[in-house]
Amino acid sequence: MSFDLRTRLDARRAEHLYRQRPLLQSPQGPQVVVDGQPLLAFCNNDYMGLANHPEVIAAWQAGAERWGVGGGASHLVIGHSTPHHELEEALAELTGRPRALLFSNGYMANLGAVTALVGQGDTVLEDRLNHASLLDAGLLSGARFSRYLHNDVTSLASHLEKSVGDTLVVTDGVFSMDGDIADLPALAQAAKAKGAWLMVDDAHGFGPLGANGAGIVEHFGLSMEDVPVLVGTLGKSFGTSGAFVAGSEELIETLIQFARPYIYTTSQPPALACATLKSLQLLRTEHWRREHLASLIQQFRQGAEQIGLQLMDSFTPIQPILIGDAGRALRLSQLLRERGLLVTAIRPPTVPAGSARLRVTLSAAHSKADVQLLLEALEQCYPLLDASESTEPVHA
């Protein structure tokens, strides 16, 4: 009996859900070249505009000269270098916590944290719109796993009443496909009332949120007691790559001992840590980046509402335009691309059926003129959806 892979692939195509990889032929930034076509991009997560910053590049180059280009071993063997340690200390300072621990990527950080903290006989409660890495972590932990209604503390409280063993409540800080933020004060209160821990993956909050860019916990003025487990990624606002978990001394030591995705993998290149240290410095000192980004978000929302687009409840750089049908979302993405703009159509299973959307993401590297070009193109293209049949573009 053979694997019938062709049938699975054909079904994806028929449902307008087939994915292909655009080939980026330039550095990240607002102006990119994709598959040979110059485009103005509104689809990366480089919120602070640091991915191609000359000082960050120079820090990476200097780090490679000093430390080489490979981690060489796992952290627990001989792969934990001085730049890694300095970056962990800087991230602990940013988050106001005693310790931080580096991971190679956000998926591994989430998987490592959840599976190290709970297992058989315990409970994991997750927002139903959490990132796939969090949902996978909950399922793989072996703990009793269930999802509460999106951002609904009443639903969470009902699940908490039925929890057993150690209970971990897990939520995104900023929800990556909707752009809305978790009601952390209410979630923290509900968790603490039942002796549960709250874990927040703030991948999209670090940078845009908080007075110093320290994310949603800083935005709400919460403490480590409110959010014992805080996860962040470095490949978005920091402009580099990797992830971290920040928390108490006991939490970090527990992860070092029990988080398998941390233990059984080679450390990231030390030069990458050098680059991230520089981007962290820029993030903390160049406050104009957050201010400029906030003004772009306001400009886009005002313009989109005037056009009559259906936006979602978001004041973050993630500004989804709800379309509904996957084919229509693909068509609008294609129409924009024909006008030199790159905005990705997001379809099931990434989002629920019937909620396909264009996911606009804004960056401090964008200009007001860039956003105006996008708004003008949307005003021209959106009415055309009803005038033509859905067709699948080359890349979506």
From Swiss-Prot:
Query: What residues does substrate bind to?
Result: R19, H131, T350
Reaction catalysed? 6-carboxyhexanoyl-[ACP] + L-alanine + H(+) = (8S)-8-amino-7-oxononanoate + holo-[ACP] + CO2
PTM N6-(pyridoxal phosphate)lysine: at which residues? K236
Q: Mind telling me which SUPFAM superfamilies this protein's record contains?
A: PLP-dependent transferases
* Pathway terms, separated by semicolons: Cofactor biosynthesis; biotin biosynthesis
Keywords on record:
Biotin biosynthesis, Pyridoxal phosphate, Transferase
Residues annotated as binding pyridoxal 5'-phosphate: G106, Y107, S176, H204, T233
Please name the CDD domains in this protein's record: KBL_like (cd06454)
Q: Name one Pfam family in it.
A: Aminotran_1_2
Q: State how it assembles.
A: Homodimer.
Q: What is this protein called?
A: 8-amino-7-oxononanoate synthase
**Upper lineage:** Bacteria, Pseudomonadati, Pseudomonadota, Gammaproteobacteria, Pseudomonadales
